[in-house]
C-alpha cells in the first residue's frame, strides 16, 4: 500500500477482500465469514483494515461490515469505516484499490 495513513497496517490487521466469492461466487457464506473475521481481528487488535480491488470485492466488504456492525452493536460497540484510496501492485501492473479502516466511535 502506498498511503501514508495505512503504513501502520500489519499483516495481522489486514484482510484482503475477494471479489470472486460471495453471492454469485463459489462460497455463498463468504460475506458472513468475512464479517466474523472483521469482528475477531477488531476485538483482538482494536483495528482492522479491509483492502479491496474491484467493485465486487468492495461490495463484499461493505456487506460484511454491515453485518459486523450489527453484531458489534449487540455488544454495545459502535463501528464506523473510514475509506481511502491505495495503489496495489499485481506483477508489473498497478491498480487503484480502496482501503476501509474499521474504527470504533466509542
What is each PLM-predicted segment?
Residues 73-106:
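C-terminal edge-of-domain segments
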Residues 21-24, 56, 78, 99:
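Compositionally biased, intrinsically disordered low-complexity regions
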Amino acid at each position: 500500500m502506498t498511503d501514508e495513513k495505512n503504513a501502520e497496517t500489519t499483516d495481522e490487521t489486514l484482510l484482503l477482500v475477494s471479489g470472486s466469492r460471495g453471492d454469485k461466487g463459489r462460497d455463498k457464506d463468504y460475506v458472513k465469514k468475512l464479517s466474523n473475521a472483521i469482528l475477531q481481528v477488531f476485538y483482538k487488535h482494536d483495528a482492522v483494515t479491509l483492502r479491496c480491488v474491484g467493485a465486487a470485492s468492495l461490495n463484499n466488504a461493505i456487506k460484511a461490515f454491515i453485518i459486523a456492525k450489527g453484531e458489534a452493536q449487540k455488544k454495545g460497540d459502535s463501528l464506523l469505516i473510514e475509506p481511502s484510496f491505495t495503489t496495489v501492485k499485481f506483477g508489473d501492473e498497478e491498480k487503484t484499490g480502496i482501503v476501509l479502516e474499521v474504527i470504533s466511535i466509542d
